[in-house]
Amino acid sequence: MSDNKFIIGSEEWCAFPALGVPAIKARVDSGARTSSIHAVNIRPFKREGEPWVSFELHPIQNSRKIILRCESKVVDRRNIKSSNGESEKRYVIASVIQLGGNAWEVELTLTNRDSMGYRMLLGREAMSNKTLVDPSESFCLGEKGDLEVEQLYGVKTAKKSGLKIGLLASNPDLYSNRRIIEAGEQRGHEMVFLNISQCYLKLDASSPEVHYRGGRVLNNVDAVIPRIRPSMTFYGCALTRHFESLNIEALNTSDAITRSRDKLFSLQLLQKNNLDIPTSGFANSPVDTKDLIDMVGGAPLIVKLLEGTQGKGVVLAETTKAAESVINAFKSLRVNLLVQEFIKEAQGKDLRCFVIDGKIVASIERTAAPGEFRANIHMGGSASIVSVSAAEKQLAIKAAKTMGLRVAGVDIIRSSRGPLLLEINSSPGLEGIESATGIDIAGAMIESIEKKLGWKAD
């Protein structure tokens, strides 16, 4: 037996200075071969060509008050069998452990230990030739009270920084994008504009990455806000999905955006969930044009390109002959379109309800410009504050939920048979609604991310 060995109990307080961990309670288990430490939001990245990993650590069991953000070089990735017999592939890091007045380097596997009794497990490999375990004792190297632990972490919480949030978009000068960047910075976060077309992906089971033009790796952002223009839907959703695979929070998920961008599919989902929509028709062949027109109640009617946005690709056909001509012309171009009843009693007006996390934060009434039937702000429409009914509120909230969107612009038209859903937008513009209402919607979007990630200002 070596004279250098020291006695430890079945539980001890450890420290990892290189990780910024001044105190963490460990379960000492000589029956376990490897050691592990609690880690969530684990994200691999490269530093000077070497594999690294970042992770978050809540060092105090059953407490989320203290969050440490740690980084370490990866020394391995191994299949580890847990106490319940399940195998998990974990990142392995090496760091110097301090136990009492002793210090040496140990290997740690990273895993979520929320369901365990301790934030750390000290296994026999880390203790080999260093310690003797007395399982009948606890804290042989000294106990730490709650006050002492809080004081040790007091410096850490005081220095807590904001989140790093990426805005996935195409034009940094658009009002909505400028406001989101501004709102995030005002709340103490690091905001990064990421041009979707300049991002590219590395698909690799062991080290997936998102790169930015020039080679910068983007795996270290805490969250992303997708603001994907229609022409970039496929690539933008693929990019968002890749961030999600890295456990990076997306304000709106790729699945939700994809659902909402498919106008036909979204109407089918709304219909399936018993949410009222204008009567609409969809057909493949020009042979069915006459029946399609009759199906929606005849002319006047609306013809919509399924790929259109901001009022573009939407035509009012005032007569049956005009409707047939427009539909057949579009069909000859091999584009997909919807035919929809025209709600004449709306008189060129509709509602835009801005929904965040299942609540309406602002509503406006949009009025079409003279001689125009489309109320979109981008088509010259005007916006004014409006009070929405309980039925309209319920319809907007249910529509956003059906799409799976945490942030949505829900368009509703008032008809003689009640409110009808027109469209659900996953990247709603902010200028018209913020200008009309004076509400800080961009700030509410940032707040949604803060709540989801459990972040609070100092």
Swiss-Prot record:
Keyword line: ATP-binding, Ligase, Magnesium, Manganese, Metal-binding, Nucleotide-binding, Protein biosynthesis
GO MF annotation terms: ATP binding; metal ion binding; ribosomal S6-glutamic acid ligase activity
ATP-binding among keywords: yes
Originating species: Shewanella pealeana (strain ATCC 700345 / ANG-SQ1)
Annotated Mg(2+) 2 binding sites: E423, N425
EC number(s) recorded for this UniProt protein: 6.3.2.-
Obligatory cofactor(s): Mg(2+); Mn(2+)
GO terms of biological process kind: protein modification process; SOS response; translation
Pfam families, per the entry: RimK, Rimk_N, Zn_protease
KW Ligase (keyword) present: yes
GO cellular component: cytoplasm
Binding site for ATP: K304, E341, F342, D350, R374, A375, N376
Enzyme class: ligase
Domain ATP-grasp span(s) in chain numbering: 267-450
Classification via InterPro entries: ATP-grasp, ATP-grasp_RimK-type, ATP_grasp_subdomain_1, Peptidase_aspartic_dom_sf, Put_Zn_protease, RimK, Rimk_N, Rp_bS6_RimK/Lys_biosynth_LsyX
Name recorded for this polypeptide: Probable alpha-L-glutamate ligase
Binding site for Mg(2+) 1: D411, E423
Cofactor binding: number and manner: Binds 2 magnesium or manganese ions per subunit.
Residues annotated for Mn(2+) 2 binding in this entry: E423, N425
